Amino acid sequence: MICMHFSVLLQESIADLNINPEGIYIDATFGRGGHSKAILDKLTSGRLIAFDKDLDAIDYATHNFQNDNFEMVHASFTYIYDYCLQHNLLGRVDGIIMDLGVSSPQLDNANRGFSFTHDGPLDMRMDISKGLTASQALEELSVDELTYIFKVYGEERFAKKIALRIKGYIAENGSITTTHQLAELIRATIGKREKKNPATRCFQALRIYVNDELKDLEILLESILDVIKKGGRVAAISFHSLEDRIVKQKFTSLINPKQETNRIAKMLPQDNSQVKMKWITKKAKANQDELSQNVRSRSAILRVVEKL
């Protein structure tokens, strides 16, 4: 299957990175290389290191990116700090781009199990070489654990009801092995109460759990100050409120530390020695032209910071 993939907020994110042609850049989420290509097009003697744990992304990079100044690393972006440590790059990186969440090719490939639009095996792993599938997770998790995952990661108000139905179904009928099976079970449990598919939130929650997405994001954000140089920039594109909240809170804590402390501390003068970054773009969304080309860009939020 050939999947059309549009890199969301491409022009805005690359412009905000203010590419140095001789600089060192990291694409934390290669995907199909839209942001990587845009960065490489602006580099002369500079270099780009890209990370992705999806084997399909690695295969795509191998066949389509032969630049001498490009390196593809099959690893989660949680490995970026260790990579930079091993290659003497800590404090030398000019910019990092992270395009979070699931990519269009992943959603459109039924065999990956990310979407209820196409029936396929209930997998949902970004890296199919390891870890539990979504189907296996549903079997292993308790009702309380599933309820927590659906409520916290999916912001699903019927979390307990859905969790009970899923575990009851598994007890009576065995594994839930396909995306349509799970989506239909959720629909039958809560009905269709709004425009979007009733399975949307639970699919998001299960994917986040299977791939440990929020914990991985926190690990990456904790490392950015050590990785980039002074004047270096970090651009983060998020697609749902949980990701964006983590990005915003981390960036804010580095820009205005007193906001992250108690009420009394907020009344005190700013201690500029604690300010590590400044906003380049506090919040940007896709324009109407991009929305008309790619409906998936409607929820995207871009935030960009620079190290002081």
From Swiss-Prot:
Cellular component aspect of the GO annotation: cytoplasm
Keyword Methyltransferase appears in the UniProt entry: yes
Binding sites annotated in the UniProt record for S-adenosyl-L-methionine: G33, G34, H35, D52, Y81, D99, Q106
Family label: Belongs to the methyltransferase superfamily. RsmH family.
Protein's recorded name: Ribosomal RNA small subunit methyltransferase H
Function summary: Specifically methylates the N4 position of cytidine in position 1402 (C1402) of 16S rRNA.
Source organism of the structure: Francisella philomiragia subsp. philomiragia (strain ATCC 25017 / CCUG 19701 / FSC 153 / O#319-036)
InterPro entries according to UniProt: RsmH, SAM-dep_MeTrfase_MraW_recog, SAM-dependent_MTases_sf
GO molecular function, one term: rRNA (cytosine-N4-)-methyltransferase activity
Catalytic activity: cytidine(1402) in 16S rRNA + S-adenosyl-L-methionine = N(4)-methylcytidine(1402) in 16S rRNA + S-adenosyl-L-homocysteine + H(+)
Pfam families: Methyltransf_5
EC code: 2.1.1.199
UniProt KW keywords: Cytoplasm, Methyltransferase, rRNA processing, S-adenosyl-L-methionine, Transferase
Location relative to the cell: Cytoplasm
EC supergroup of this enzyme: transferase
Sections of the chain in a coiled coil: none
GO biological process terms held by the UniProt record: rRNA base methylation
